[in-house]
C-alpha cells in the first residue's frame, strides 16, 4: 500500500467533494453580494476546477471578475458561458457591460442588442438603444 501525502493546492482540491462545492458556490454568491468579489473568485476556482462544465459557477465567477474590475478574465468567462448557452440574455448583457467598461463600443452594442432580442427587459432595451415607448 502506498502512503503518500498530498500537499499544497492539490490537497485543497483533493479535500473537496460535491457537497463542499455546493457550499463554496453558495458562499461565493454571498461574498459577491457582500462586495467581496475576490473572495468569491477564490472559492469558485476550486468549484470550476472540479466541475469545468458548470455554467452557473462560470457565470458567477465572470460576475465576480467584473465586480473586481478584472475585465479580461470576466470577458473570457462570459464568452465561455455564451459558447455553451448562446441564448443566455443575462450573459450577453453582462458581456456587453464588460466590453463597454473596456472601451469596446461596437462589441458592447452587439451584445446589448442580442440581450434585448432574447429578453426584452426594459434595462436591456434601453442599453441596446431601442425605444421603450416611455
Predicted segments with their positions:
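Long, contiguous interaction/recruitment modules in multidomain scaffold/adaptor proteins
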Residues: 1-23
Amino acid at each position: 500500500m502506498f502512503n503518500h501525502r498530498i500537499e499544497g493546492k492539490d490537497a485543497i482540491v483533493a479535500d473537496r467533494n460535491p457537497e463542499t462545492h455546493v457550499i463554496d458556490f453558495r458562499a461565493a454568491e454571498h461574498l459577491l453580494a457582500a462586495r467581496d468579489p475576490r473572495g468569491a473568485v477564490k472559492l469558485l476556482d476550486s468549484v470550476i476546477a472540479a466541475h469545468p462544465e458548470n455554467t452557473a459557477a462560470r457565470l458567477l465567477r465572470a460576475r465576480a471578475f467584473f465586480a473586481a474590475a478584472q475585465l479580461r478574465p470576466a470577458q473570457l468567462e462570459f464568452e465561455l458561458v455564451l459558447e455553451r448557452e448562446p441564448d443566455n440574455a443575462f450573459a450577453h448583457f453582462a458581456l456587453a457591460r464588460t466590453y463597454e467598461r473596456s472601451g469596446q463600443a461596437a462589441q458592447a452594442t452587439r451584445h446589448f442588442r442580442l440581450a434585448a432580442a432574447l429578453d426584452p427587459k426594459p434595462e436591456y432595451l434601453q442599453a441596446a438603444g431601442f425605444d421603450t415607448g416611455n
